[in-house]
Amino acid sequence: MLRVLLVTDTDKPIGDLRDALARLGYDMLAETATPEALHRIVQSERPDVIIIDTESPSRDTLEQLAVMNAAAPRPVLMFSADANQQLIRDAVGAGVTAYLVEGLATERLAPILEVALARFAQESQLRERLAQAENELAE
């Protein structure tokens, strides 16, 4: 069972989201992190997947994601109202696996999570192959 950490910087209630994820069979971590606490909570709780609900990801959030992704990469889904192309590129560069605009709809969660998990697994394999090739070249 995958462990999911929810991160939000909005005032929207997230009970429906938590319920939908639980119905899909995900283990919901007890704490809903704020972007500022992301790195600390990821280190202590070790979620398998992170879902971020934000109006617009802040520079601090993206920096925390980049640090987390460098230390212990994991799939990150970001739901945002901000469709700014540069912001989307920055989010992907920080480690966001899937960036979705137009808000978080619980009925779309299952396919979105499946795509994000598959893409993350593929990227992880590529990173491993790259590291192996670099090691072989160094020898």
Where do the PLM segments sit?
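C-terminal output helix
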Residues: 86-87, 104-113
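Short hydrophobic/Thr-rich beta-strand motif most characteristic of the beta2 strand and flanking loop
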Residues: 25-34, 41
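Conserved phosphotransfer microenvironments
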Residues: 14, 34-39, 48-68, 83-84
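Conserved acidic segment of CheY-like receiver
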Residues: 1-13, 17-21, 50
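CheY-like receiver
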Residues: 119-139
